């Protein structure tokens, strides 16, 4: 017999991989005491109840029912509700084994999403005394989360319902079922469930599935917004769960992405939960939790909501020292680990961003452990830089300006084009500068041009400008631009495009630089950008006109418009390009010849444009029916647009500064009007004298006037 392979190595490697370790320079912390030991010791308290297997006949029926609900091809709401009722009748008494089955758990989740309030209560009743087991289960925990969200909506409805709604609900109960459970308020059922979880709270914190249930319970008790279960930045589900829900097409209903009213008893339950959890923690274990991949988000949430029920902020002071205390060597080592660890930095960033911690707590940590090395932390592109970004919007104005003074002169060095590092830092610096009254704005602009367009002359841009600006930011070479395999734009491309759009919104100099880069591109490459799902937005955002535009910029605008010649019809018939053609209507203000040229190009292939869904929208937005049939009215639209650009509408109170040629024309018109008035007065005087001479009344009047003067 050959030598047998020793067992348990994979598990040992995995535990070592997941085990958080402090750096060697972290003093006074026991590096041997890892959270893995706590995890292994707590697993003994995890309930593991077996609810039975679903047989093949039942499985086929429930799979078909799940598919029917997924397609949702019911003719009416009543038909769908009838189908749900029949499935619930078939599932009665089998709910627990269905939610623990991979396939049937999807059906139960759909049933809960579509169920009415009475049906929800029935399902809730079936789960009683088994909530803990379901929370620790891989599939059942997802069903339980959906049930909790809908239960929160039902609790709010019971709190706010009118007498008429109560009467209607009572009638529905009598018609559907005589079960006494429907007479019990949902609030009482929910509190009963909360009591089931209390002995297991410390075990739930670091469990892969139960921790998500615990976070949702805390959000409901605190009356916070319950996030979506499918959006990428949701705190409700894990990343894998959100991807899976998209693949199986389970969508949230209107109960997600909102907060609910909660009864006063929930505050007491939240206080009890916080006290129960904190009783099982000390400073060492709490700090270990804060750098634990699963436990850290739970601790972040507890710090965020503890202020609702605990003035002393026990969780915060369990991890960090009191605000009256000075620098501590153990705390300093812990903060240093947070600033250099991926999980720890996310924990610190989250508690700074959220409104749970008091500003003086954050200010203490900043002054003691971060202020003297702001620039060094900003160079940690995967950890410390996110802390600095969060601090920019939480500290006092003086401290924010200090951070800006440290980072702005080195901004060009901090940004890495190749590694796509610190683009977010540039974004946050711009926002912080704007919030401080455009603090050091010109320096930020110069630093960004030094980094992304070092050869570009900001004051005197020339015609031989290269494409380095958009190439360095968008990384067009190697992107999905021009691919014929229908590749989806990557998240990286989307992030870069949004950054360029941000720069163009920040200062018009970036718009001018982008125009020169567009003109330096081969026309085919530029057209590919217009057809790209992400880069088309960059083109669209660049087509803006500055108020009181100088003549040189207007000439540059004409040159940019020449690129679109012979491309209008193709763009108009494309889902992305059609938005660009729509934008050209405003971009061609004061350039009626270019408007006419674009409209003529659309008219030349009107049949093709009108056959396209997007082309028809462009045809309408450009007022092409007026262009074809009533050219004078179309010209009136252009004139109206020019008046709006100059601010000469009837409702406008401010007048623009007039150009010299306009002032000269006004002077000439005023002089001509004055001369006409003088000529008219002279003519009227001559006519009057002739009339007086003819009637003989003039001399008498003169005598009378002379007598008065005497």
From Swiss-Prot:
Main location (coarse class): nucleus
Pfam families: PUF_NOP9
BP GO terms, sorted: endonucleolytic cleavage in 5'-ETS of tricistronic rRNA transcript (SSU-rRNA, 5.8S rRNA, LSU-rRNA); endonucleolytic cleavage in ITS1 to separate SSU-rRNA from 5.8S rRNA and LSU-rRNA from tricistronic rRNA transcript (SSU-rRNA, 5.8S rRNA, LSU-rRNA); endonucleolytic cleavage to generate mature 5'-end of SSU-rRNA from (SSU-rRNA, 5.8S rRNA, LSU-rRNA); ribosomal small subunit export from nucleus
Compositional bias annotation for Basic and acidic residues: 652-680
Region (Disordered) location: 1-43, 648-710
Organism domain of life: Eukaryota
Stored PROSITE patterns: PUM (PS50302)
Keyword Cell membrane recorded: no
Keyword Repeat: yes
Subcellular location: Nucleus, Nucleolus
Pumilio repeats, residue ranges: 90-125, 126-161, 196-232, 280-321, 329-367, 369-405, 520-557, 562-600
InterPro entries noted in UniProt: ARM-like (IPR011989), ARM-type_fold (IPR016024), NOP9 (IPR040000), Pumilio_RNA-bd_rpt (IPR001313)
Gene Ontology MF term list: RNA binding
Keywords per UniProt: Nucleus, Repeat, Ribosome biogenesis, rRNA processing
GO cellular component, one term: 90S preribosome
SUPFAM superfamilies from the UniProt entry: ARM repeat
Composition-biased stretches (Basic residues): 1-16
Entry similarity comment: Belongs to the NOP9 family.
Role summary: RNA-binding nucleolar protein required for pre-rRNA processing. Involved in production of 18S rRNA and assembly of small ribosomal subunit.
The protein's name in its UniProt record: Nucleolar protein 9
Protein source organism: Candida dubliniensis (strain CD36 / ATCC MYA-646 / CBS 7987 / NCPF 3949 / NRRL Y-17841) (Yeast)
Name of the gene encoding the protein in the UniProt record: NOP9
């Amino acid at each position: 017999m050959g030598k047998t392979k020793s067992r348990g190595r994979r598990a040992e490697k995995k535990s070592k991989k997941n085990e958080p370790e402090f750096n060697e320079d972290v003093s006074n912390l026991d590096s041997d005491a890892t959270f893995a030991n706590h995890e292994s010791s707590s697993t003994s308290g995890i309930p593991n109840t077996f609810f039975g297997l679903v047989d093949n006949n039942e499985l086929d029926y429930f799979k078909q029912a799940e598919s029917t609900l997924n397609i949702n091809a019911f003719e009416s709401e009543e038909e769908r509700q009838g189908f749900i009722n029949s499935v619930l009748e078939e599932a009665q008494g089998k709910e627990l084994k269905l939610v623990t089955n991979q396939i049937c758990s999807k059906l139960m989740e759909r049933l809960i999403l579509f169920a009415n309030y009475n049906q929800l209560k029935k399902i809730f009743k079936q789960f009683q005394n088994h909530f803990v087991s379901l929370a620790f289960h891989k599939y059942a925990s997802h069903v339980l989360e959906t049930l909790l969200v809908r239960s929160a909506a039902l609790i709010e409805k019971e709190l706010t319902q009118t007498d008429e709604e109560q009467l209607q609900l009572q009638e529905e109960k009598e018609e559907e079922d005589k079960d006494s459970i429907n007479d019990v308020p949902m609030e009482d059922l929910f509190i009963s469930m909360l009591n089931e979880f209390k002995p297991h709270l410390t075990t739930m914190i670091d469990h892969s599935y139960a921790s998500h249930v615990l976070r949702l319970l805390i959000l409901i008790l605190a009356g916070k917004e319950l996030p979506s279960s499918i959006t990428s930045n949701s705190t409700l589900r894990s990343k894998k769960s959100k991807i899976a829900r998209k693949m199986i097409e389970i969508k949230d209903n209107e109960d997600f992405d909102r907060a609910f009213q909660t009864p006063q008893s929930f505050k007491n339950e939240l206080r009890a939960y916080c006290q129960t959890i904190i009783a099982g923690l000390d400073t060492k274990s709490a700090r270990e939790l804060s750098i634990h991949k699963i436990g850290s988000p739970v601790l972040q949430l507890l710090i965020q909501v503890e202020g609702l029920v605990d003035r002393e902020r026990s969780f915060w002071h369990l991890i960090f020292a009191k605000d009256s205390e000075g620098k501590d060597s153990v705390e300093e080592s812990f903060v240093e680990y947070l600033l250099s660890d991926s999980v720890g930095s996310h924990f610190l960033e989250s508690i700074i961003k959220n409104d749970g911690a008091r500003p003086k707590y954050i200010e203490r940590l900043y002054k003691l452990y971060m202020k003297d090395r702001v620039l060094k932390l900003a160079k940690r592109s995967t950890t410390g830089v996110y802390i600095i970004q969060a601090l920019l919007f939480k500290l006092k104005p003086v401290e924010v300006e200090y951070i800006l003074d440290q980072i702005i002169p080195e901004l060009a060095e901090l940004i890495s084009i190749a590694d796509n590092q610190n683009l977010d830092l540039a974004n946050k610096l711009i926002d912080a500068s704007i919030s401080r009254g455009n603090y050091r704005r010109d320096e930020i602009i110069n630093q960004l041009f030094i980094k992304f367009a070092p050869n570009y002359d900001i004051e005197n841009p020339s015609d031989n400008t290269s494409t380095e600006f958009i190439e360095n930011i968008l990384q067009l070479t190697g992107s999905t631009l021009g691919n014929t395999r229908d590749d989806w734009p990557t998240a990286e491309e989307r992030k870069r495009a949004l950054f360029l759009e941000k720069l163009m919104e920040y200062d018009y100099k970036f718009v001018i630089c982008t125009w020169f880069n567009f003109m330096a591109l081969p026309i085919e490459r530029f057209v590919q950008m217009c057809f790209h799902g992400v880069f088309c937005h960059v083109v669209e955002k660049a087509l803006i006109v500055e108020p009181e535009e100088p003549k040189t910029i207007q000439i540059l605008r004409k040159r940019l418009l020449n690129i679109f010649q012979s491309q209008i019809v193709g763009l108009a018939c494309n889902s992305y390009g059609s938005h660009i053609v729509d934008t050209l209507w405003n971009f061609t203000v004061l350039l009626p010849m270019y408007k006419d040229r674009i409209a003529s190009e659309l008219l030349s292939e009107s049949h093709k444009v009108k056959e396209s869904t997007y082309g028809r929208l462009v045809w309408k937005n450009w007022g092409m029916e007026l262009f074809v049939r009533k050219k004078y009215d179309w010209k009136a639209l252009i004139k109206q647009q020019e008046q709006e650009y100059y601010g000469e509408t009837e409702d406008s109170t401010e007048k623009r500064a007039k150009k010299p040629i306009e002032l000269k024309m006004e002077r000439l018109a005023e002089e001509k009007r004055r001369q006409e008035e003088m000529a008219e007065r002279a003519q009227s005087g001559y006519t009057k004298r002739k009339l007086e001479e003819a009637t003989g009344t003039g001399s008498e009047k003169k005598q009378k006037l002379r007598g008065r003067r005497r």
